[in-house]
Structure formats: structure tokens, C-alpha cells
Regions:
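Short coil-to-beta-strand transition motifs
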Residues: 145-149, 197
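Conserved AMP-binding/adenylation subdomain of ANL enzymes
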Residues: 1-17, 22-64, 79
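Gly/Ser/Thr-rich phosphate-binding loop
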Residues: 39, 63-68, 77-139, 151
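A structural signal for the hydrophobic beta-strands that form the central parallel beta-sheet
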Residues: 17, 43, 68, 96, ...
Length: 199
């Protein structure tokens, strides 16, 4: 229920995600979480990188929460005066995941729209987001802090914790974490290490 508790979803919200429903990012952020609280969602069948179509959808259906990937934010930002040509005033929250969000794109979006983008990390194995920036506490270029119910750590290739400032592999644990991959014993052994998921 990270979407409900962390992002403050209510029955008055309307979500719009360009991520397709066969991705956990799309089905969680644009179907399961909004429906859980009685909110509505905008289902989008168009190509996600067609910025004008995405903006027209926002203008027409007036979502309050926009969920997409950095590539789409970049495509929108490449349209001159998009914020004057399209009404995106219904948005109260924007989220990003799927790839790193460059700090330059975050700053350009904030300058043009007045809205922060909350960069997040999640995966299919945890069902959705396990780390995110908080509203009003965003550090552009960072994916934030663990969401309640999840723990993370950085480890080396042998699974030993690395000191602060050292690059490592991200591990996560939480109640929604999968237990194994069906019929993939070797991949399961590599990825699921006790209660920790080796991302």
C-alpha cells in the first residue's frame, strides 16, 4: 500500500500513467493503488513518447497524479512552451521510475510546471516502489529513501555491506518481496538471498 500511504492517494485523485499495465509500474500506479482508495485512472493506449498526445491526455482528462519515465519527461520538455500550449494545471504530483532521472530534467520540469518530480525505484520482485523522494524533500539526481516497510543496503559482489561512499549492489527486503522465480532455480539462488532481494 505504498501508493496509498506514501503518496497520499485519495478518492479525489485521478492517476495517469504512460507505463503499460503489463509492467508493475503501470498496474500498481495506475490501477491497483487508485482503485484501492476509490480514485479513478486514465488508461492510455497511445505511444508513450509522443509528447503532444501525452499532454493532450493530461489536458483532456485532468489527472492529479502523473506517472511516467524520464524519457517521456524529456520528450515533453523538448516541446517549446509546452506549459503554455497545454493545460497541465490539474497535476498535484508527478512521479518517475524505470531509469535514472537526470537532475537537469528535474529542474527544467519544476521550472516549467511548478511541480516536483518524485523519482522512485521499484521492481517486479517487490511488486512496486520501495524507495522514493518525499514531497518537499527532493534531491534532484537521487532516488530518495526507503519507503516504510522496506529496508535497503549496499553490498559488494559477495554480499558484504560496503562502507558509506563506496559503490555497491542494492539489496532490499520487505513484506511484498517475491520468494522465487518459477522454474528458474539458478536465478532464484542468485537473486533471493534469505529475506533479501539482490537487485
Amino acid at each position: 500500500l505504498s501508493g496509498v500511504n506514501f503518496f497520499g492517494l485519495t478518492e479525489n485523485d485521478r492517476t495517469f500513467s504512460v507505463a503499460k499495465l503489463f509492467f508493475v509500474y503501470g498496474i500498481g500506479g495506475n490501477l491497483i493503488f487508485p482503485w484501492y482508495v476509490g480514485a479513478s485512472c486514465v488508461l492510455y493506449a497511445g505511444p508513450p513518447r509522443q509528447a503532444a498526445a501525452v499532454l493532450k491526455t493530461i489536458e483532456t482528462y485532468k489527472p492529479t497524479i502523473f506517472v511516467c519515465v524520464p524519457t517521456v519527461y524529456g520528450a515533453i520538455l523538448s516541446l517549446p512552451d509546452f506549459n503554455k500550449r497545454y493545460d497541465i494545471g490539474s497535476l498535484r504530483l508527478c512521479m518517475s521510475a524505470g531509469e535514472p532521472l537526470p537532475s537537469g530534467a528535474w529542474n527544467a520540469w519544476k521550472d516549467a510546471s511548478g511541480i516536483e518530480i518524485l523519482d522512485t525505484i521499484g521492481c517486479t520482485e517487490t511488486y512496486h516502489t520501495f524507495m522514493a523522494n518525499r514531497p518537499g524533500e527532493v534531491r534532484p539526481g537521487s532516488s530518495g529513501k526507503p519507503i516504510g516497510g522496506y529496508d535497503v543496503r549496499l553490498v559488494d559482489d559477495e554480499g558484504q555491506d560496503v562502507p558509506t561512499g563506496v559503490i555497491g549492489n542494492l539489496m532490499v527486503r520487505g513484506e511484498s518481496t517475491a520468494l522465487f522465480y518459477l522454474h528458474q532455480c539458478e536465478k532464484t539462488r542468485h537473486t533471493f538471498r534469505g529475506e533479501w532481494l539482490f537487485t
